[in-house]
Amino acid sequence: MPMQGAQRKLLGSLNSTPTATSNLGLAANRTGAPCLELPIPDGLFLSLGLVSLVENVLVVAAIAKNRNLHSSMYCFICCLALSDLLVSGSNMLEAGVLATRASVVQQLHNTIDVLTCSSMLCSLCFLGAIAVDRYISIFYALRYHSIMTLPRAQRAVAAIWVASVLSSTLFITYYDHAAVLLCLVVFFLAMLVLMAVLYVHMLAWACQHAQGIIRLHKRQPPAHKGFGLRGAATLTILLGIFFLCWGPFFLRLTLVVFCPQHLTCNCIFKNFKVFLTLIICNTIIDPLIYAFRSQELRRTLKEVLGRGRW
């Protein structure tokens, strides 16, 4: 089912080249202009999606099982895992629907697009929520439990899910407006800036705190420098993974708006599945960064799995 011209759906139809670039792509082939297209085997795509599903299901199951993990922080981590689960699951389902030519199955496309878009928005929102939660736990430590109560966290979670579903419905309905794509790009940049500012501030505070301890105990400065380097490396990895996994997808949305007829942009459009694969990779990495580092959660996972040592 070719999806050229006015893109029929916000996410599903982005797995194609706009009309203007369709003819230009043929011209590029005639002139011999190089165009790098990275093929992603369906088996690899589905395997990554399956790994993401298993990982995030384990996170949700562990948090649901252990009452000690029923806190605002783990509430956001659980919802991040759930949204990541939906991201990978909906993309796998999307791939299956696109591969099926039956008209009845194709009618599910709009529903799947809304699910995919809303789960992506939720995933970004919960990454930001986790950053805010950690920021409050550091800079308002004495009042943290009165500020970030579980009911407040649950209300924030409900608001994020409702806002994401409503926004996704509007985005899918008005998919052919450039403003829709720009809103998504601006939202991604806002989350990136929010996370960068909060984590950089937390790192700066941690370095100052470590320096104060060093002065108090009269230790050697190199220890502080080593701590700062480790913290900077951790921050670089955290934000770098976020940007590398999500950035190409939103770069493509930006190019769809600003250069739909450019040959170079046309080459980028052809790698849509690569960008989705990077997002799936992010849903695999998120549990490793935010969930599996918790000793309590790992202990609960051992009980859930009922075998071996975690």
Swiss-Prot record:
Arranged from A to Z, the UniProt key words for this protein are:
Cell membrane, G-protein coupled receptor, Glycoprotein, Membrane, Receptor, Transducer, Transmembrane, Transmembrane helix
Compartment list: Cell membrane
- Report a single Gene Ontology molecular function: melanocyte-stimulating hormone receptor activity
Glycosylated residues, per the record, are: N29
How does this protein lie in the membrane? Multi-pass membrane protein
Question: Extracellular compartment: which residues?
Answer: 1-37, 94-110, 176-183, 259-271
Which is a Gene Ontology cellular component entry for this protein?
Answer: plasma membrane
Q: Which PROSITE patterns does this UniProt record tie to the protein? A: G_PROTEIN_RECEP_F1_1, G_PROTEIN_RECEP_F1_2
GO biological process terms held by the UniProt record: adenylate cyclase-activating G protein-coupled receptor signaling pathway
**One Pfam match:** 7tm_1
| Cytoplasmic compartment segments | 64-72, 133-155, 204-232, 293-310
Q: Which residues cross the membrane?
A: 38-63, 73-93, 111-132, 156-175, 184-203, 233-258, 272-292
Source organism's superkingdom?
Eukaryota
Purpose: Receptor for MSH (alpha, beta and gamma) and ACTH. The activity of this receptor is mediated by G proteins which activate adenylate cyclase. Mediates melanogenesis, the production of eumelanin (black/brown) and phaeomelanin (red/yellow), via regulation of cAMP signaling in melanocytes.
Please give the subunit comment from the record. Interacts with MGRN1, but does not undergo MGRN1-mediated ubiquitination; this interaction competes with GNAS-binding and thus inhibits agonist-induced cAMP production. Interacts with OPN3; the interaction results in a decrease in MC1R-mediated cAMP signaling and ultimately a decrease in melanin production in melanocytes.
Tell me the protein family, please.
Belongs to the G-protein coupled receptor 1 family.
Which protein are we looking at? Answer: Melanocyte-stimulating hormone receptor
Give the source species. Leontopithecus chrysomelas (Golden-headed lion tamarin)
Q: Which gene encodes it?
A: MC1R
